[in-house]
Amino acid sequence: MLDITTLRKDLDSVIARLETRKSPQAFLNVDTFRTLEAERKTIQMRTEELQGKRNTLSKQIGQLKAKGAAGQAESDAVMAEVAGLKAELETSATRLEQIQLELQALLLGVPNLPHESVPVGADEHGNVVVRSWSPDGKGPKAFDFEVKDHVDIGTPLGLDFELGVKLTGARFTVMKGLIARLHRALAQFMLDVQTQEHGYTECYTPYIVNAQSMRGTGQLPKFEADLFAAKKGGQEAEAAPDNSALYLIPTSEVPLTNFVRDVVLAEAELPVKLTAHTPCFRSEAGSAGRDTRGLIRQHQFDKVEMVQIVHPDKSYETLEQMTGHAEAILQKLGLPYRVMSLCTGDMGFGASKTYDLEVWLPAQNTYREISSVSNCEAFQARRLQARFKNAQGKNELVHTLNGSGLAVGRALVAVLENYQNADGSVTVPQALRPYVGGQKVLGATAMNDMDM
């Protein structure tokens, strides 16, 4: 959530920065904001006036009572006037509280302001390539045979989309045998790198969170259509009271970042570095017809998430560091990739600046997103009331950052396609071999003998 003081001081500048973002409608109803602000100022000025008058009259009452019977009549009149002022003050306080709630609701739908270093653009075409990497420095590998996509490669290894549809529906899949083992190996490898080499604390979190947690990280109220709501005690989530509604997590960023909700940290405790491997659940409400084949866009997928809670002075340094932590996974796996600086029109709701890592997929002959690393500055912290006690002993909002380290399913896609062989087998990347019993090659003939 934006700092309302910034809007009050320089509304025109805020509007100009917000207009560089992509949206089918205005992010901020400026007329409503100005109307509420005008009423708030009027009520506050009137309140201060009434409080001053009440204080003056209260002193008069004491002086009149000191006169005894001679001042009784006048004292009673002044007391009646004070009682009237009290009633008006209570009415004003109630309305002022309502206005604050209306302003807060208005701000909950406003995205973060782009950092000055973010390129201005309308959509993904405005994103800027920062750097690219490949094992030999010459770009993606050239194959001397016709490449297959991950569906054709993975199906003989145990990738089963038809069974996923049978069990649940479209955009769900089942993995069995070798492919399931490779998927697990990727997740374990990612966790080991993030915890053992990059210093993150591994966490296990609930896969279901409450509405307050979703609001804290910015998924609610604006993106409820993208979430899977859970039933509680036979009650439809939509019918449940707001704070009792439950949702499947779209990313473990939500529970991990909420660790510091309503917490005041000591400055010495910063940075807080957390990671978790969880399933993620997304309705993909706006993705009808896109990536309908394969694992690229699923309702359920696994991801290893990185979250850092940091001192505000360190957040942009940390953004570069976390991007490097995600890159390290791709480099260790030997997967060609590029780093993109997202433009204003392509950034997520809560981000001030975002880097996307895109991995090369030979069958698509293009790069596809596999990680997104974002600095949210104080945007989430303000919603969460996540603070630290600074050197002056005052409570100050932390900055929050999050990133994928990495999306496990898409990493599986990249390994299958980049390490495929002409006979349909897949060479196991050197970094993953300890996690698959030392196997160097996975092929259909090595499929586990499973009675299905």
From Swiss-Prot:
Q: In which pathway does it act?
A: Aminoacyl-tRNA biosynthesis; selenocysteinyl-tRNA(Sec) biosynthesis; L-seryl-tRNA(Sec) from L-serine and tRNA(Sec): step 1/1
Family listed: Belongs to the class-II aminoacyl-tRNA synthetase family. Type-1 seryl-tRNA synthetase subfamily.
Q: Supply one GO molecular-function term.
A: ATP binding
Task: Give the protein's biological function.
Answer: Catalyzes the attachment of serine to tRNA(Ser). Is also able to aminoacylate tRNA(Sec) with serine, to form the misacylated tRNA L-seryl-tRNA(Sec), which will be further converted into selenocysteinyl-tRNA(Sec).
What is catalysed by this protein?
A: tRNA(Ser) + L-serine + ATP = L-seryl-tRNA(Ser) + AMP + diphosphate + H(+); tRNA(Sec) + L-serine + ATP = L-seryl-tRNA(Sec) + AMP + diphosphate + H(+)
EC number(s) from the headed UniProt entry: 6.1.1.11
What is one Gene Ontology biological process annotated in the Swiss-Prot or TrEMBL record? Answer: seryl-tRNA aminoacylation
Subunit composition?
A: Homodimer. The tRNA molecule binds across the dimer.
- Compartments, record wording: Cytoplasm
Q: Which UniProt keywords apply?
A: Aminoacyl-tRNA synthetase, ATP-binding, Cytoplasm, Ligase, Nucleotide-binding, Protein biosynthesis
Q: Where does L-serine bind?
A: T251, S252, E253, E305, S404
Q: What class of enzyme is it?
A: ligase
Task: List cellular component terms (GO).
Answer: cytoplasm
Which PROSITE patterns would you find in this protein's record?
A: AA_TRNA_LIGASE_II
Q: Does the keyword ATP-binding apply?
A: yes
Kindly provide the name given to this protein in its UniProt entry. Serine--tRNA ligase
Top-level taxon: Bacteria
Residue positions binding ATP: R282, S283, E284, E369, I370, S371, S372
Task: Identify the species of origin.
Answer: Albidiferax ferrireducens (strain ATCC BAA-621 / DSM 15236 / T118) (Rhodoferax ferrireducens)
Domain commentary: Consists of two distinct domains, a catalytic core and a N-terminal extension that is involved in tRNA binding.
Matches recorded under SUPFAM superfamilies: Class II aaRS and biotin synthetases, tRNA-binding arm
